[in-house]
Amino acid sequence: MSRVCQVTGKRPTVGNNRSHARNATRRRFLPNLQTHRFWVESESRFVKLRLSAKGMRIIDKKGIDSVLTDIRARGEKI
């Protein structure tokens, strides 16, 4: 399973670790992904999504039905 938020599309980014001597070694910054189950009243079922903390906030603001419509419009199967 890829480390990509299904709502925002956030994915790992790359950067540097920095030691006290300012030596740079490459590293990955991973998104804060959570697997969360949402009850969808219109479909009378639970939907399991893998999303970031920001994705959860978007669902709180817009509603699960609106977000699912956007995800399906992108062609993702839920």
UniProtKB/Swiss-Prot annotation:
Protein name: Large ribosomal subunit protein bL28
Zinc-finger in keyword set: no
UniProt GO BP: translation
Keyword Cytoplasm among UniProt keywords: no
One Pfam match: Ribosomal_L28
Keywords, sorted A to Z: Ribonucleoprotein, Ribosomal protein
Highest taxon in the source lineage: Bacteria
